[in-house]
């Protein structure tokens, strides 16, 4: 296990988003100088105590100017589903250009879309990528751009994790789907309850990013690390929710066939069904390589992470 390295200044692109805010808070707590780049209308959602830079991320030159002097740039920009094909690659190019101009290390949050419907049960840094969805293909294209930039001297760290939950704000499978009907005593799970699914508690991912950033000089120019979070069955996940709320729930399931039919006219449903295999295909991330670099991977116990996540959503436990 390597010891801590240099700190410095980090600019978080998308600092008002769920990952951006969690990462900004983690870096600030670790003693970094943190700037949160946000749209003006979302400045109030950025991490308190960080420098707020109001910039439209679609303005590449403004982003490059805002990141001047950064040691690390985190691309935490959250592209809405409907705008993914139009904006994801240009925004990634902007982040690459900004980091290159500042000679900063670029950190990018990878996910599991890259591996497609034939993904294996165990995923590590050597697993071949065969995307079967539009989003997966775009993710591979983005990572290819970053790898090419690394060949030209840009240091890049991809932290690959499962589905995020926790943190401030909304936008995860947990709040949008699973606990949407919790007040009525119902949970909706997206897949078979006995299938293992990889989850990542946002605070833990943010802590891992800090530790990698502090060891950045010791990594390869293009480093991809798998973050092993909570690989649990749906049954284990909903049981943790029940324990947190001290009650049982009726379990419903996402009607994927209906959503697929509706996807013909509702683009967001089409995008969701494209990655529905993530809920029916058992999978887990192998975190051995990340452990070699930072030691024990940050992993808040599932019950505690679920309880904190529900509290952040304003959902109180009984008693």
Regions of interest found by a model, annotated:
Residues 111, 144-168:
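Conserved beta-loop-beta element that borders a ligand/cofactor-binding pocket
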Residues 170-176, 191-213, 222-223:
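Substrate-positioning beta->alpha
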Residues 2-10, 17, 211-272, 287, ...:
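Mid/C-terminal beta-alpha module of Rossmann-like enzyme folds, strongest
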Residues 8-30:
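N-terminal Rossmann NAD(P)H-binding glycine-rich loop of SDR-like oxidoreductase domains
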Residues 85-89, 128, 132-144, 172-176, ...:
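Short-chain dehydrogenase/reductase
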Residues 41-102:
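NAD(P)H-binding glycine-rich loop region in Rossmannoid oxidoreductase-like domains
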Residues 93-141, 157:
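Conserved Rossmann-fold NAD(P)-dependent oxidoreductase catalytic core, especially the SDR/UDP-sugar
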Residues 152, 162-196, 241:
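NAD(P)-dependent short-chain dehydrogenase/reductase
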């Amino acid at each position: 296990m390597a010891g801590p390295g240099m700190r410095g200044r980090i600019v978080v692109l998308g600092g008002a988003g769920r990952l951006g805010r969690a990462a900004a808070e983690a870096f600030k707590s670790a003693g970094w100088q943190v700037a949160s780049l946000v749209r003006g209308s979302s400045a109030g959602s950025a991490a308190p105590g960080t420098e707020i830079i109001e910039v439209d991320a679609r303005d590449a030159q403004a982003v490059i100017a805002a990141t001047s002097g950064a040691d690390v740039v985190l691309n935490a920009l959250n592209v809405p589903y409907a705008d993914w094909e139009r904006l994801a690659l240009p925004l990634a190019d902007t982040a690459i250009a900004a980091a290159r101009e500042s000679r900063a290390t670029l950190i990018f949050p990878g996910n599991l879309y890259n591996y497609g419907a034939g993904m294996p049960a165990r995923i590590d840094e050597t697993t071949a990528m065969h995307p079967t969805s539009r989003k997966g293909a775009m993710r591979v294209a983005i990572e290819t751009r970053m790898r090419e930039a690394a060949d030209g001297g840009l240091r890049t760290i991809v932290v690959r994790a499962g589905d995020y939950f926790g943190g401030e704000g909304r936008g995860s499978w947990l709040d949008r789907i699973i606990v949407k009907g919790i007040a009525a005593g119902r949970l909706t799970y997206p897949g078979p309850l006995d299938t293992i699914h990889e989850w990542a508690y946002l605070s833990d991912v943010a802590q891992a990013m800090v530790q990698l950033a502090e060891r950045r000089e010791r990594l390869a120019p293009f480093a991809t690390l798998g973050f092993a979070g909570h690989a649990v069955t749906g049954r284990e996940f909903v049981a943790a929710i029940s324990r947190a709320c001290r009650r049982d729930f009726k379990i419903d399931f996402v009607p994927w066939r209906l959503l697929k039919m509706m996807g013909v006219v509702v683009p967001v449903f089409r995008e969701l069904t494209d990655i529905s295999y993530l809920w029916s295909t058992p999978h887990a991330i192998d975190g051995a390589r990340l452990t070699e670099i930072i030691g024990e991977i940050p992993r808040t116990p599932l019950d505690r992470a679920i309880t904190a996540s529900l509290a952040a959503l304003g959902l109180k436990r009984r008693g």
